[in-house]
Regions:
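N-terminal Rossmann NAD(P)H-binding glycine-rich loop of SDR-like oxidoreductase domains
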Residues: 5-27
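Glycine-rich Rossmann NAD(P)(H)-binding loop
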Residues: 8, 176-178, 200-205, 231-239, ...
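NAD(P)H-binding glycine-rich loop region in Rossmannoid oxidoreductase-like domains
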Residues: 51-94
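Conserved Rossmann-fold NAD(P)-dependent oxidoreductase catalytic core, especially the SDR/UDP-sugar
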Residues: 97-144
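Active-site Tyr-X1-5-Lys
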Residues: 141-169
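Substrate-positioning beta->alpha
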Residues: 151, 182-186, 200-224, 229
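Mid/C-terminal beta-alpha module of Rossmann-like enzyme folds, strongest
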Residues: 215-277, 291, 311-313, 320-332, ...
Length: 351
């Protein structure tokens, strides 16, 4: 009898692609895709079950489908079709708790794969040059996706202690960048699409990127090879933010660090971008991780470097100076939103 894999988060592009990749594997008998909303992408032969992982009904899905492997892809960075940031927080944290509770009671689940994020390391002025998997963050993430990811990983570690018979693999993805990736899966991609990009004055952070093909290949390998552990997943090489923006041909507006919070509020009014505190920290201090364990212990070497990932993104989304009228329009909206965020007397101040 072949493997039966359940994939969460298939309404988003990355979850759908993960499920389609797995269903094409001849060693896997069936793939079940779960989400609270119907998928926009074609799932092919994946069996879709509309279910909310925040609801205990997910335990019934595991039992009825006789699932032996769970791939948790629905921890996301930003608001999607399902609602605002409160709904994202609930899905990320409460949804994971319910899913793990269902896995703990299951007699068939023997493999759990979590798509996590290098955001768990945070970003601060005191960070090491490279984060390895067993390093704690120098400054704990206080909000947003980074905090959610850290909480989710803590619940997964607790599950692993209670169910030592289950192989648990945590894949900490660097910031994924690719054409067609949902904004709540790639806040950095949404940021790089801005025609006028705000940067933190006086800082030029080092960044790593991950091509979605490499991230999904690592997920696939975690399902079929089962080498439990925690692994950083990132493309080789590093680029500074200024190098990235030059290669994309984006216009920039440097902002003093004291005004970044207000600019974040302005961006929420002028565009769909949610510039959270963890994103601001990343765009100030950067983050670089070591991928030796991924290569030597897990047995996977990313095929796309950070530079090649950026090049692929640029080719797909366009590069070079954007239309001047569009830049002026965004600039005017940003200035107006900035003024509104500050209030009539500049009453909104950053701490």
């Amino acid at each position: 009898m072949g493997r039966v894999v359940l994939v969460t988060g298939v309404a988003a592009t990355l979850g759908a692609r993960a499920a389609r990749r797995l269903v094409d594997d001849p060693g896997i008998e069936r793939v079940v895709g779960v989400d609270v909303l119907p998928p926009r992408d074609d799932l092919g032969d994946v069996r879709f079950v509309r279910a909310d992982i925040r609801n205990p009904v997910i335990a019934k899905v595991l039992a009825v489908e006789d699932v032996d492997t769970v791939v948790h892809m629905s921890v996301v960075a930003g608001a999607g079709r399902a609602g605002g940031l409160a709904a994202v927080k609930e899905t990320n944290v409460i949804g994971t708790m319910q899913l793990l509770a269902a896995c703990q009671r299951s007699s068939t689940v023997g493999n759990l794969v979590l798509k996590s994020s290098t955001a768990v390391y945070g970003a601060s002025a005191h960070d090491p040059g490279l984060f390895v998997e067993d390093m704690p963050p120098r400054q704990l993430p206080l909000s947003g996706y980074a905090k959610d990811s850290a909480e989710v990983e803590s619940y997964v570690r607790g599950f692993a202690r209670r169910r030592p018979d289950v192989a648990v693999t945590v894949l900490r993805w660097a910031d994924v960048l690719g054409a067609g990736i949902d904004s709540h899966d790639s806040q950095l991609g949404q940021y790089f699409r801005l025609p006028l990009v705000p940067t933190v004055l006086g800082f030029d952070p080092r960044l790593q990127l991950l091509h979605p093909d490499d991230g999904l290949a690592a997920v696939h390998q975690a399902v079929v090879v089962m080498r439990p552990g925690t692994y950083n997943v990132a493309g080789p090489g590093v680029l500074t933010l200024s190098q990235i923006l030059r290669r994309l041909g984006r216009a920039t507006v440097p902002v003093p660090v004291q005004g970044v919070g207000t600019v974040g509020q302005a961006l929420r009014r002028a565009s769909d971008l949610e510039l959270s505190s963890d994103q601001v920290a990343l765009l100030t201090h950067g983050r670089v991780v070591d991928t030796t364990a991924l290569r030597d212990r897990f047995g996977y070497e990313p095929r796309w470097s950070t530079a090649a990932t950026l090049e692929d993104f640029a080719e797909a989304t366009g590069r070079g100076p954007l239309d001047a009228r569009r830049i002026r329009s965004v600039e005017q909206r940003l200035v107006a939103a900035y003024a509104a965020a500050r209030g009539p007397r500049g009453g909104t101040h950053d701490a």
